[in-house]
Amino acid sequence: MTGVTGTEDTKVIESKINELNIDKSKPEKTNKVNKSDDVDNDDVDNDDNDDEDNDDDDDEITESGNSASSSGDKKKKKNKNKNKKKKKKKIISIDSSYPEGIFPEGQWMEYPLEDINSYRITSEEKRYLDRQQNNKWQDFRKGAEIHRRVRHKAQSSIKPGMTMIEIANLIEDSIRNYSNNDHTLKSGIGFPTGLSLNHVAAHYTPNTGDKLILKKDDIMKVDIGIHVNGRICDSAFTMTFNDEGKYDNIMKAVKEATYTGIKESGIDVRLNDIGAAIQEVMESYEMEENGKIYPIKCIKNLNGHNIDDFIIHSGKSVPIIANGDMTKMEEGEIFAIETFGSTGNGYVLPEGECSHYAMNKNIQHLKPPSERSKQLLESIKQNFGTLPWCRRYLERTGEEKYLFALNQLVRHGIIEEYPPIVDKRGSYTAQYEHTILLHPHKKEVVTKGDDY
Protein backbone atom coordinates (compact mmCIF):
# COMPACT_ATOMS: atom_id res chain seq x y z
CA MET A 1 0.00 0.00 0.00
CA THR A 2 1.16 3.50 -0.87
CA GLY A 3 1.91 6.13 1.74
CA VAL A 4 0.22 9.52 1.36
CA THR A 5 1.13 12.39 3.63
CA GLY A 6 -0.99 15.52 4.03
CA THR A 7 1.05 18.69 3.49
CA GLU A 8 -1.44 21.56 3.16
CA ASP A 9 -0.63 23.12 6.56
CA THR A 10 3.14 23.18 6.04
CA LYS A 11 2.81 24.71 2.55
CA VAL A 12 1.22 27.84 4.05
CA ILE A 13 4.09 28.21 6.51
CA GLU A 14 6.74 27.50 3.86
CA SER A 15 5.39 30.21 1.55
CA LYS A 16 5.57 32.78 4.36
CA ILE A 17 9.09 31.69 5.25
CA ASN A 18 10.26 32.00 1.65
CA GLU A 19 8.82 35.52 1.43
CA LEU A 20 10.72 36.57 4.53
CA ASN A 21 13.91 34.67 3.63
CA ILE A 22 13.87 32.88 6.95
CA ASP A 23 15.41 29.40 7.19
CA LYS A 24 13.03 26.68 8.30
CA SER A 25 14.94 24.59 10.83
CA LYS A 26 12.18 22.47 12.31
CA PRO A 27 11.26 19.36 10.26
CA GLU A 28 7.63 18.53 9.54
CA LYS A 29 6.11 15.78 11.67
CA THR A 30 4.42 12.90 9.94
CA ASN A 31 2.52 9.90 11.22
CA LYS A 32 2.93 6.55 9.50
CA VAL A 33 -0.23 4.45 9.54
CA ASN A 34 -0.34 1.10 7.77
CA LYS A 35 1.62 2.57 4.86
CA SER A 36 -1.59 3.94 3.29
CA ASP A 37 -2.61 6.44 5.97
CA ASP A 38 -2.14 10.18 5.67
CA VAL A 39 -2.13 12.76 8.43
CA ASP A 40 -5.30 14.50 7.22
CA ASN A 41 -7.25 11.30 7.48
CA ASP A 42 -6.09 9.92 10.75
CA ASP A 43 -4.66 11.82 13.67
CA VAL A 44 -7.72 13.63 14.96
CA ASP A 45 -6.03 14.37 18.28
CA ASN A 46 -2.58 15.21 16.93
CA ASP A 47 -1.93 18.64 18.38
CA ASP A 48 1.13 19.13 16.15
CA ASN A 49 -1.23 19.44 13.18
CA ASP A 50 -3.86 21.68 14.85
CA ASP A 51 -4.94 24.88 13.17
CA GLU A 52 -3.95 26.76 16.32
CA ASP A 53 -0.37 25.56 15.93
CA ASN A 54 -0.30 27.10 12.46
CA ASP A 55 -1.58 30.37 13.91
CA ASP A 56 1.31 30.28 16.39
CA ASP A 57 3.79 29.78 13.57
CA ASP A 58 2.31 32.70 11.62
CA ASP A 59 2.71 34.94 14.66
CA GLU A 60 6.34 33.92 15.06
CA ILE A 61 7.05 34.67 11.38
CA THR A 62 5.44 38.10 11.63
CA GLU A 63 7.45 38.91 14.75
CA SER A 64 10.80 37.91 13.28
CA GLY A 65 10.06 39.76 10.02
CA ASN A 66 9.15 43.01 11.76
CA SER A 67 12.24 44.56 13.34
CA ALA A 68 10.16 47.38 14.84
CA SER A 69 8.12 45.07 17.08
CA SER A 70 8.83 45.56 20.75
CA SER A 71 9.67 42.73 23.15
CA GLY A 72 6.53 43.65 25.09
CA ASP A 73 4.37 43.03 22.01
CA LYS A 74 6.05 39.68 21.53
CA LYS A 75 5.31 38.63 25.09
CA LYS A 76 1.66 39.64 24.72
CA LYS A 77 1.35 37.59 21.56
CA LYS A 78 2.97 34.57 23.17
CA ASN A 79 0.69 34.80 26.19
CA LYS A 80 -2.30 35.20 23.91
CA ASN A 81 -1.29 32.12 21.96
CA LYS A 82 -0.83 30.11 25.13
CA ASN A 83 -4.36 30.94 26.20
CA LYS A 84 -5.88 29.93 22.89
CA LYS A 85 -7.97 26.80 23.08
CA LYS A 86 -6.66 23.90 21.02
CA LYS A 87 -8.88 22.73 18.19
CA LYS A 88 -9.05 19.10 17.20
CA LYS A 89 -8.55 18.43 13.54
CA LYS A 90 -11.54 16.81 11.89
CA ILE A 91 -11.12 13.46 10.18
CA ILE A 92 -11.54 13.86 6.42
CA SER A 93 -13.50 11.43 4.26
CA ILE A 94 -11.47 8.54 2.86
CA ASP A 95 -12.58 9.58 -0.64
CA SER A 96 -10.41 12.69 -0.45
CA SER A 97 -7.31 10.48 -0.38
CA TYR A 98 -8.49 8.39 -3.33
CA PRO A 99 -10.39 10.79 -5.62
CA GLU A 100 -10.36 8.33 -8.52
CA GLY A 101 -12.07 5.67 -6.42
CA ILE A 102 -9.19 3.18 -6.66
CA PHE A 103 -8.38 1.89 -3.17
CA PRO A 104 -5.41 -0.16 -1.91
CA GLU A 105 -5.60 -3.88 -2.54
CA GLY A 106 -5.28 -6.31 0.32
CA GLN A 107 -2.66 -9.03 0.67
CA TRP A 108 -2.72 -11.50 -2.24
CA MET A 109 -2.17 -15.17 -1.47
CA GLU A 110 -1.97 -18.25 -3.67
CA TYR A 111 -4.59 -20.96 -3.32
CA PRO A 112 -3.45 -24.13 -1.51
CA LEU A 113 -4.18 -26.50 -4.41
CA GLU A 114 -1.54 -26.08 -7.12
CA ASP A 115 -3.56 -27.68 -9.92
CA ILE A 116 -6.55 -25.41 -9.25
CA ASN A 117 -4.27 -22.38 -8.94
CA SER A 118 -2.52 -23.14 -12.24
CA TYR A 119 -5.84 -23.43 -14.05
CA ARG A 120 -7.16 -20.15 -12.67
CA ILE A 121 -4.02 -18.17 -13.51
CA THR A 122 -4.02 -19.28 -17.17
CA SER A 123 -7.76 -18.82 -17.68
CA GLU A 124 -8.15 -15.43 -19.38
CA GLU A 125 -11.92 -15.80 -19.32
CA LYS A 126 -11.89 -16.15 -15.53
CA ARG A 127 -9.64 -13.13 -15.14
CA TYR A 128 -11.91 -11.12 -17.43
CA LEU A 129 -14.98 -12.05 -15.39
CA ASP A 130 -13.16 -11.05 -12.21
CA ARG A 131 -12.45 -7.61 -13.66
CA GLN A 132 -16.16 -7.18 -14.37
CA GLN A 133 -16.73 -7.19 -10.61
CA ASN A 134 -14.25 -4.37 -10.05
CA ASN A 135 -16.86 -2.09 -8.46
CA LYS A 136 -17.64 -4.81 -5.93
CA TRP A 137 -13.96 -5.31 -5.10
CA GLN A 138 -13.42 -1.54 -4.79
CA ASP A 139 -16.26 -1.35 -2.27
CA PHE A 140 -14.53 -3.98 -0.14
CA ARG A 141 -11.15 -2.27 -0.50
CA LYS A 142 -12.60 1.08 0.48
CA GLY A 143 -14.20 -0.45 3.56
CA ALA A 144 -10.94 -2.19 4.41
CA GLU A 145 -8.94 1.04 4.15
CA ILE A 146 -11.39 2.75 6.49
CA HIS A 147 -11.08 -0.25 8.82
CA ARG A 148 -7.27 0.05 8.93
CA ARG A 149 -7.42 3.74 9.80
CA VAL A 150 -10.16 3.34 12.38
CA ARG A 151 -8.38 0.54 14.18
CA HIS A 152 -5.12 2.50 14.15
CA LYS A 153 -6.99 5.28 15.91
CA ALA A 154 -8.44 2.77 18.37
CA GLN A 155 -5.12 1.07 19.07
CA SER A 156 -3.38 4.37 19.74
CA SER A 157 -6.18 5.93 21.80
CA ILE A 158 -7.80 3.24 23.96
CA LYS A 159 -6.49 3.21 27.51
CA PRO A 160 -7.56 1.62 30.82
CA GLY A 161 -9.92 3.92 32.70
CA MET A 162 -12.08 4.68 29.66
CA THR A 163 -15.71 3.64 29.77
CA MET A 164 -16.94 1.19 27.16
CA ILE A 165 -19.30 3.90 25.89
CA GLU A 166 -16.32 6.19 25.30
CA ILE A 167 -14.45 3.46 23.43
CA ALA A 168 -17.46 2.58 21.28
CA ASN A 169 -18.08 6.25 20.43
CA LEU A 170 -14.41 6.75 19.53
CA ILE A 171 -14.51 3.89 17.03
CA GLU A 172 -17.96 4.52 15.60
CA ASP A 173 -17.53 8.28 15.19
CA SER A 174 -14.30 7.61 13.29
CA ILE A 175 -16.18 5.25 10.95
CA ARG A 176 -18.88 7.85 10.34
CA ASN A 177 -16.32 10.56 9.62
CA TYR A 178 -14.24 8.47 7.23
CA SER A 179 -17.39 7.29 5.47
CA ASN A 180 -18.65 10.89 5.32
CA ASN A 181 -22.15 9.53 5.21
CA ASP A 182 -24.94 9.44 7.77
CA HIS A 183 -27.10 7.13 5.64
CA THR A 184 -26.40 3.75 7.21
CA LEU A 185 -27.54 1.75 4.18
CA LYS A 186 -25.14 3.51 1.80
CA SER A 187 -21.97 3.12 3.83
CA GLY A 188 -20.72 3.19 7.39
CA ILE A 189 -21.00 0.87 10.37
CA GLY A 190 -21.52 -2.75 9.30
CA PHE A 191 -22.54 -4.08 12.72
CA PRO A 192 -22.28 -3.02 16.38
CA THR A 193 -18.72 -2.56 17.59
CA GLY A 194 -17.79 -5.59 19.69
CA LEU A 195 -15.87 -4.79 22.88
CA SER A 196 -16.07 -8.09 24.74
CA LEU A 197 -13.96 -8.46 27.89
CA ASN A 198 -12.27 -11.49 29.46
CA HIS A 199 -14.62 -14.52 29.55
CA VAL A 200 -17.11 -12.73 27.28
CA ALA A 201 -16.17 -13.92 23.80
CA ALA A 202 -18.45 -11.88 21.53
CA HIS A 203 -21.62 -9.81 20.99
CA TYR A 204 -21.07 -7.26 23.74
CA THR A 205 -21.40 -3.58 22.98
CA PRO A 206 -22.51 -1.08 25.62
CA ASN A 207 -26.11 0.05 25.83
CA THR A 208 -26.86 3.63 26.82
CA GLY A 209 -26.10 4.12 30.51
CA ASP A 210 -23.56 1.29 30.71
CA LYS A 211 -20.97 2.23 33.36
CA LEU A 212 -18.45 -0.54 32.62
CA ILE A 213 -14.84 0.68 32.66
CA LEU A 214 -11.85 -0.88 30.92
CA LYS A 215 -9.25 -2.09 33.45
CA LYS A 216 -5.53 -2.69 33.04
CA ASP A 217 -5.80 -6.46 33.45
CA ASP A 218 -8.66 -6.87 30.95
CA ILE A 219 -8.29 -8.69 27.65
CA MET A 220 -10.61 -7.05 25.10
CA LYS A 221 -11.80 -8.33 21.74
CA VAL A 222 -12.39 -5.42 19.34
CA ASP A 223 -14.66 -6.51 16.48
CA ILE A 224 -15.30 -3.79 13.89
CA GLY A 225 -17.57 -3.97 10.85
CA ILE A 226 -17.57 -1.44 8.01
CA HIS A 227 -19.68 -1.62 4.88
CA VAL A 228 -19.76 0.22 1.56
CA ASN A 229 -22.93 -0.36 -0.48
CA GLY A 230 -23.66 -3.39 1.69
CA ARG A 231 -20.23 -5.00 1.12
CA ILE A 232 -19.15 -5.73 4.69
CA CYS A 233 -15.55 -5.86 5.91
CA ASP A 234 -15.44 -7.87 9.14
CA SER A 235 -12.15 -7.85 11.04
CA ALA A 236 -11.24 -8.20 14.72
CA PHE A 237 -8.23 -8.04 17.00
CA THR A 238 -7.46 -8.40 20.71
CA MET A 239 -6.07 -5.69 23.00
CA THR A 240 -4.32 -6.11 26.36
CA PHE A 241 -2.69 -3.65 28.74
CA ASN A 242 -0.95 -6.00 31.18
CA ASP A 243 2.79 -5.21 31.23
CA GLU A 244 3.84 -8.71 32.30
CA GLY A 245 2.98 -10.49 29.05
CA LYS A 246 0.26 -12.48 30.78
CA TYR A 247 -1.81 -12.87 27.62
CA ASP A 248 0.98 -13.27 25.08
CA ASN A 249 0.45 -16.99 24.49
CA ILE A 250 -3.30 -16.91 24.02
CA MET A 251 -3.01 -13.99 21.62
CA LYS A 252 -0.25 -15.72 19.68
CA ALA A 253 -2.27 -18.94 19.52
CA VAL A 254 -5.38 -17.23 18.16
CA LYS A 255 -3.53 -15.04 15.68
CA GLU A 256 -1.56 -18.00 14.30
CA ALA A 257 -4.73 -20.10 14.14
CA THR A 258 -6.51 -17.37 12.17
CA TYR A 259 -3.69 -17.10 9.65
CA THR A 260 -3.63 -20.87 9.33
CA GLY A 261 -7.33 -20.73 8.46
CA ILE A 262 -6.67 -18.03 5.88
CA LYS A 263 -3.79 -20.00 4.36
CA GLU A 264 -5.90 -23.16 4.06
CA SER A 265 -8.93 -21.37 2.57
CA GLY A 266 -9.60 -21.42 -1.14
CA ILE A 267 -11.84 -22.48 -4.00
CA ASP A 268 -13.01 -26.11 -3.67
CA VAL A 269 -11.49 -26.46 -0.17
CA ARG A 270 -13.71 -28.33 2.30
CA LEU A 271 -14.72 -26.44 5.42
CA ASN A 272 -13.83 -29.39 7.66
CA ASP A 273 -10.23 -29.30 6.45
CA ILE A 274 -9.90 -25.64 7.38
CA GLY A 275 -11.32 -26.29 10.84
CA ALA A 276 -8.97 -29.22 11.42
CA ALA A 277 -5.92 -27.11 10.54
CA ILE A 278 -7.06 -24.30 12.83
CA GLN A 279 -7.67 -26.67 15.73
CA GLU A 280 -4.25 -28.28 15.42
CA VAL A 281 -2.50 -24.92 15.72
CA MET A 282 -4.71 -23.44 18.44
CA GLU A 283 -4.53 -26.41 20.77
CA SER A 284 -0.74 -26.63 20.59
CA TYR A 285 -0.57 -23.62 22.95
CA GLU A 286 -1.08 -23.18 26.67
CA MET A 287 -1.17 -20.24 29.07
CA GLU A 288 0.28 -19.89 32.56
CA GLU A 289 -1.33 -17.88 35.34
CA ASN A 290 -0.19 -17.87 38.97
CA GLY A 291 1.87 -21.00 38.41
CA LYS A 292 -1.00 -22.96 36.88
CA ILE A 293 -1.02 -24.13 33.25
CA TYR A 294 -4.21 -23.76 31.18
CA PRO A 295 -4.53 -25.40 27.76
CA ILE A 296 -5.83 -23.04 25.10
CA LYS A 297 -8.95 -24.46 23.49
CA CYS A 298 -10.88 -23.56 20.36
CA ILE A 299 -14.34 -22.25 21.22
CA LYS A 300 -16.04 -25.03 19.33
CA ASN A 301 -19.44 -23.39 18.82
CA LEU A 302 -18.06 -20.19 17.29
CA ASN A 303 -17.22 -20.06 13.59
CA GLY A 304 -16.13 -17.96 10.68
CA HIS A 305 -18.77 -17.34 8.01
CA ASN A 306 -19.41 -16.24 4.46
CA ILE A 307 -20.71 -12.73 3.79
CA ASP A 308 -23.30 -11.50 1.31
CA ASP A 309 -24.51 -7.99 0.49
CA PHE A 310 -26.03 -6.51 3.66
CA ILE A 311 -25.90 -9.96 5.31
CA ILE A 312 -23.07 -10.62 7.74
CA HIS A 313 -23.74 -14.36 8.19
CA SER A 314 -24.86 -15.68 4.83
CA GLY A 315 -25.22 -19.42 5.39
CA LYS A 316 -21.86 -21.17 5.31
CA SER A 317 -19.93 -21.53 8.57
CA VAL A 318 -16.17 -21.97 8.71
CA PRO A 319 -15.50 -24.18 11.76
CA ILE A 320 -12.47 -23.78 14.00
CA ILE A 321 -12.45 -27.49 14.82
CA ALA A 322 -12.73 -30.61 12.67
CA ASN A 323 -16.50 -31.08 12.46
CA GLY A 324 -16.98 -33.27 9.40
CA ASP A 325 -18.52 -30.54 7.21
CA MET A 326 -17.67 -31.46 3.61
CA THR A 327 -19.14 -28.24 2.15
CA LYS A 328 -16.71 -26.50 -0.22
CA MET A 329 -15.76 -22.86 -0.61
CA GLU A 330 -16.65 -21.51 -4.05
CA GLU A 331 -15.24 -18.97 -6.46
CA GLY A 332 -16.40 -15.40 -5.87
CA GLU A 333 -17.45 -15.99 -2.28
CA ILE A 334 -16.51 -13.68 0.58
CA PHE A 335 -15.52 -15.17 3.93
CA ALA A 336 -14.72 -13.85 7.39
CA ILE A 337 -12.06 -16.18 8.77
CA GLU A 338 -12.10 -15.81 12.54
CA THR A 339 -10.92 -17.91 15.43
CA PHE A 340 -11.55 -17.77 19.17
CA GLY A 341 -9.30 -19.27 21.84
CA SER A 342 -10.20 -19.80 25.49
CA THR A 343 -8.64 -20.96 28.75
CA GLY A 344 -12.09 -22.08 29.89
CA ASN A 345 -14.47 -24.75 28.61
CA GLY A 346 -14.07 -23.90 24.94
CA TYR A 347 -17.84 -23.52 24.68
CA VAL A 348 -19.97 -20.38 25.01
CA LEU A 349 -23.52 -19.68 26.16
CA PRO A 350 -25.69 -16.53 26.02
CA GLU A 351 -25.63 -14.39 29.15
CA GLY A 352 -26.34 -10.79 30.07
CA GLU A 353 -28.30 -7.86 28.69
CA CYS A 354 -28.76 -7.94 24.93
CA SER A 355 -27.47 -5.11 22.76
CA HIS A 356 -27.15 -6.74 19.29
CA TYR A 357 -30.16 -7.17 17.00
CA ALA A 358 -30.89 -7.85 13.33
CA MET A 359 -33.99 -8.13 11.20
CA ASN A 360 -34.99 -11.65 10.20
CA LYS A 361 -34.32 -12.08 6.48
CA ASN A 362 -37.53 -14.09 6.05
CA ILE A 363 -40.30 -11.92 7.47
CA GLN A 364 -42.68 -11.86 4.52
CA HIS A 365 -45.27 -13.94 6.37
CA LEU A 366 -44.73 -12.24 9.74
CA LYS A 367 -46.80 -9.27 10.87
CA PRO A 368 -45.99 -6.84 13.69
CA PRO A 369 -48.39 -7.37 16.61
CA SER A 370 -49.09 -3.68 17.32
CA GLU A 371 -49.12 -0.29 15.65
CA ARG A 372 -46.06 0.84 17.63
CA SER A 373 -44.10 -2.28 16.71
CA LYS A 374 -45.10 -1.73 13.07
CA GLN A 375 -43.74 1.82 13.21
CA LEU A 376 -40.54 0.59 14.84
CA LEU A 377 -40.06 -2.10 12.20
CA GLU A 378 -40.39 0.48 9.42
CA SER A 379 -37.72 2.60 11.09
CA ILE A 380 -35.42 -0.43 11.35
CA LYS A 381 -35.96 -1.30 7.67
CA GLN A 382 -35.21 2.25 6.54
CA ASN A 383 -32.11 2.72 8.68
CA PHE A 384 -30.51 -0.73 8.86
CA GLY A 385 -32.22 -3.16 6.50
CA THR A 386 -30.71 -6.57 7.24
CA LEU A 387 -27.53 -5.12 8.78
CA PRO A 388 -27.10 -5.81 12.52
CA TRP A 389 -27.58 -2.87 14.88
CA CYS A 390 -27.68 -2.05 18.58
CA ARG A 391 -29.91 0.02 20.83
CA ARG A 392 -27.58 3.02 20.68
CA TYR A 393 -27.95 3.15 16.90
CA LEU A 394 -31.73 2.97 17.21
CA GLU A 395 -31.70 5.88 19.64
CA ARG A 396 -29.50 7.83 17.25
CA THR A 397 -32.33 7.68 14.69
CA GLY A 398 -34.61 9.44 17.20
CA GLU A 399 -36.44 6.41 18.56
CA GLU A 400 -37.64 6.72 22.17
CA LYS A 401 -39.61 4.42 24.47
CA TYR A 402 -39.15 1.56 22.05
CA LEU A 403 -38.24 -1.38 24.31
CA PHE A 404 -41.74 -2.83 24.63
CA ALA A 405 -42.27 -2.72 20.86
CA LEU A 406 -38.79 -4.14 20.26
CA ASN A 407 -39.46 -7.06 22.58
CA GLN A 408 -42.73 -7.69 20.72
CA LEU A 409 -40.84 -7.93 17.42
CA VAL A 410 -38.33 -10.30 19.02
CA ARG A 411 -41.05 -12.56 20.44
CA HIS A 412 -42.74 -12.77 17.04
CA GLY A 413 -39.49 -13.73 15.28
CA ILE A 414 -39.36 -10.55 13.20
CA ILE A 415 -36.24 -9.26 14.95
CA GLU A 416 -33.51 -11.63 16.10
CA GLU A 417 -31.52 -10.84 19.24
CA TYR A 418 -27.87 -11.74 19.82
CA PRO A 419 -26.97 -11.43 23.53
CA PRO A 420 -23.37 -11.60 24.77
CA ILE A 421 -21.88 -15.09 24.61
CA VAL A 422 -19.59 -16.20 27.41
CA ASP A 423 -17.28 -18.99 28.55
CA LYS A 424 -16.99 -19.77 32.27
CA ARG A 425 -16.19 -16.91 34.62
CA GLY A 426 -12.52 -16.48 35.38
CA SER A 427 -11.44 -17.71 31.95
CA TYR A 428 -9.89 -15.61 29.20
CA THR A 429 -10.82 -15.46 25.53
CA ALA A 430 -9.15 -13.91 22.48
CA GLN A 431 -10.14 -13.34 18.85
CA TYR A 432 -8.55 -12.45 15.50
CA GLU A 433 -10.37 -12.15 12.19
CA HIS A 434 -9.94 -11.07 8.56
CA THR A 435 -12.18 -10.84 5.51
CA ILE A 436 -10.98 -12.67 2.39
CA LEU A 437 -12.16 -12.43 -1.23
CA LEU A 438 -11.99 -15.58 -3.37
CA HIS A 439 -10.97 -14.29 -6.80
CA PRO A 440 -10.69 -16.79 -9.70
CA HIS A 441 -6.88 -16.80 -9.64
CA LYS A 442 -5.90 -15.85 -6.06
CA LYS A 443 -7.42 -14.92 -2.71
CA GLU A 444 -7.20 -11.41 -1.33
CA VAL A 445 -6.96 -10.79 2.42
CA VAL A 446 -8.63 -7.45 1.96
CA THR A 447 -8.53 -6.24 5.59
CA LYS A 448 -4.84 -7.08 6.13
CA GLY A 449 -2.75 -4.29 7.62
CA ASP A 450 0.65 -3.69 9.18
CA ASP A 451 -0.80 -4.31 12.63
CA TYR A 452 -2.17 -7.83 12.04
Swiss-Prot record:
Question: Which Gene Ontology MF annotations are present?
Answer: initiator methionyl aminopeptidase activity; metal ion binding; metalloaminopeptidase activity
Give its E.C. classification number.
Answer: 3.4.11.18
- Does Protease show up as a keyword for this record? yes
What sort of enzyme, by top EC class, is this? hydrolase
| Chief site of localization | cytoplasm
> A single GO BP annotation from the record?
proteolysis
Give the protein's biological function. Cotranslationally removes the N-terminal methionine from nascent proteins. The N-terminal methionine is often cleaved when the second residue in the primary sequence is small and uncharged (Met-Ala-, Cys, Gly, Pro, Ser, Thr, or Val).
Protein name listed in UniProt: Methionine aminopeptidase 2
- Which organism was this protein described from? Candida dubliniensis (strain CD36 / ATCC MYA-646 / CBS 7987 / NCPF 3949 / NRRL Y-17841)
